């Protein structure tokens, strides 16, 4: 606030000296009035202040300097607001984050903050923006988890219709695309005024990534057991032949997964379906099963391993080396679960190097930092109470 100083000099008594007190009071009132007006003007200027950010699509977006509310669209975009401890700023979500079931939910951020599902609906279709809904919600900024360059077109059209700035970001895995992941966390932190927390999140994932790599023994692939993960979810639940070429528990631990030998052009990275003949040819020594498969048609991967005659000849089935991990793909990747799974896998593949790790305690340490609650027990209950276990197929 600007302060007006008024200096009054008394020059002695005269015929107007009796008016001095009244003049003084008048001048004080005038100064207070103008000071108030100037203060209001300054406050209005501050409230109208803007900054320009460069979003993940390279778009220059002008946003308020002090964002108070955000609406979200795109799969799992609320995840990052929870990571940044900015969940109270969310005023609208798209269809993906507008639904949750406490008895089946596997998204840690939704278990910690189920009330997100009760927020206003920004878009009835994932990764879109309904202009009318946006105007009704009236957020300061819309954050858009895009799925390609076409997201920029959607964002520009929405801003043209509503006047609300839209900041786009892609999802990157901190395990294998750490720089882009870090850029986007910083971007989101800048938008919502959580720059310090953004750096904490980046450091947290970077430290886990480095720790997992450092624990991995220097062995040739021939010295390592052949591993496979089946039952991986991706836009639905699947059976044994659905796998994940970039499963964090294998990539960071340099595991001997034969799926890595398949040309990348033949596989997706989030998930891929392989031929049964290939799996039998690889004959894994150890099989991990994503528990998202429990909801697949026919009972999923565990039932298939038990009942399909062709699987009975696999080394992992014969020796009973079948283990379970939590589903980490629901509304895209839940990075905390990906890393929690990796620590569990480490205790199985390299027990000596991971002898100090209690997988359940480690998982809750991760969840507490990222979503504010130790939600492993809830996740385990929602996946048949089978997480992080060696499975006896006779009990399935």
Located regions from the model:
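A short, structured surface patch at a secondary-structure boundary
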Residues: 78-137, 141, 146-147, 258-260, ...
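Structural recognition of the beta-strand scaffold that forms the well-ordered cores
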Residues: 71-73, 91-94, 141-145, 166-170, ...
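Solvent-exposed loop/turn segments at secondary-structure junctions
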Residues: 76-79, 96-99, 141-142, 147-151, ...
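Secretory targeting signatures
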Residues: 1-48
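Short helices/loops that flank or line small-molecule/ion binding pockets
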Residues: 65, 128-141, 273-283
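Extracytoplasmic substrate-binding proteins
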Residues: 60, 154-236, 317-387, 391-394
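His/Asp/Glu-enriched short active-site or ligand-binding loop at hydrolase and phosphoryl-transfer sites
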Residues: 246-268, 319-326
């Amino acid at each position: 606030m600007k302060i007006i100083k008024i200096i009054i000099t008394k020059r002695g008594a005269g015929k107007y000296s009796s008016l001095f007190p009244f003049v003084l009071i008048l001048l004080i009132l005038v100064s207070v009035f103008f000071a108030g007006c100037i203060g209001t003007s300054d406050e209005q200027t501050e409230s109208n202040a803007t900054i320009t950010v460069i979003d993940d699509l390279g778009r220059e977006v002008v946003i308020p300097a002090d964002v108070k509310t955000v609406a979200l669209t795109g799969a799992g975009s609320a995840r990052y607001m929870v990571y940044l401890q900015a969940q109270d700023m969310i005023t609208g979500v798209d269809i993906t984050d507008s639904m949750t079931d406490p008895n089946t939910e596997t998204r840690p951020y939704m278990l910690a903050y189920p009330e997100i599902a009760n927020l206003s609906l920004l878009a009835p279709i994932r990764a879109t923006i309904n202009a009318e809904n946006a105007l009704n919600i009236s957020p300061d900024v819309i954050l858009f988890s895009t799925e390609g360059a076409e997201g920029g077109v959607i964002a520009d059209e929405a801003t043209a219709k509503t006047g609300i700035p839209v900041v786009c970001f892609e999802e990157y895995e901190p395990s294998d695309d750490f720089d882009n992941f870090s850029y986007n966390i910083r971007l989101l932190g800048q938008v919502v005024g959580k720059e310090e927390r953004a750096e904490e999140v980046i450091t947290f994932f970077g430290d886990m990534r480095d720790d997992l790599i450092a624990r991995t023994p220097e062995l040739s692939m021939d010295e390592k057991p052949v591993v496979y993960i089946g039952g991986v979810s991706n836009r639905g639940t699947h059976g044994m032949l659905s796998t994940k070429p970039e499963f964090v528990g294998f990539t960071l631990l340099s595991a001997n997964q034969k799926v890595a030998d398949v040309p990348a052009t033949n596989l997706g990275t989030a998930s891929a379906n392989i031929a049964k003949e290939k799996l039998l040819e690889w004959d894994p020594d150890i099989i991990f099963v994503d528990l998202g498969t429990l909801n697949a048609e026919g009972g999923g991967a565990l039932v298939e391993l038990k009942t399909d005659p062709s699987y009975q000849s696999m080394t992992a089935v014969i020796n009973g080396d079948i283990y379970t991990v939590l589903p980490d793909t629901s509304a895209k990747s839940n990075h905390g679960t990906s890393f929690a799974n990796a620590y569990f896998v480490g205790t199985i593949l390299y027990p000596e190097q991971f002898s100090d790790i209690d997988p359940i305690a480690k998982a809750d340490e991760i969840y507490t930092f990222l979503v504010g609650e130790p939600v492993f027990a809830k996740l385990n209950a929602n996946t048949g109470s089978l997480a992080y276990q060696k499975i006896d197929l006779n009990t399935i």
